Amino acid sequence: MLRRTALLALGLALALPSVAAAATIQFNPPITCMQQGKSYPLGGSGFTPEYAMRVTWEGASASFYPDSSGALPGNESSEITAPEYDSLTPKTLAITATDSNPATTATLSIPIVKFGSNLPVEGKPSKVVTWMFAGFVNNAPIYGHYLYGRKEKKTVRFGSGQGPCGTLTKRAVRFPIKRPKNFGTWEIRIDSNPKWVRSSESLAETSFTVAKPRRG
């Protein structure tokens, strides 16, 4: 009797459909924030093997084919591009991946922001203004290099990026040199280097004019 019961239980277990693992999506390599307009490889698992799946995000979509194990490769063949977003204040982007054989859905929410700075250098040099920065992830330091004739004249440390998108808002003077000896066109370069490196890429940069003060 016990043997018959055990065999019956085994038969029922074999007859039940297996429960598929929940589908998931993630960026490969992992990121904490998307830069507007930049492409990122999307990986995933738990989808119908070799069956078309669709990924949608803020008015855009793309179709991919998972491999024989139901996984997305997370390389150039499964990239998605962040939408244009002209703001230094992050917003949340929702990404949804679905297939219909059987219906499978995975979602991912991630902040998106414009990397850079508002660069408020136009106006009275001595005025204290609001500086905004974004894209300095992992608490990266934020430096502003003031250049004249392509030579570094002053470097200011504004602080460090905060949160998943490496943002910072700080009140600081427009132009940190009280009595400049050079007038005309200056440049400012924003990056994470304590000293300006000519070959380094800036996260934000612009030129501005420092006028010679009038006498009398």
Predicted region positions:
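Bacterial N-terminal signal peptides that target proteins for export
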Residues: M1-L8
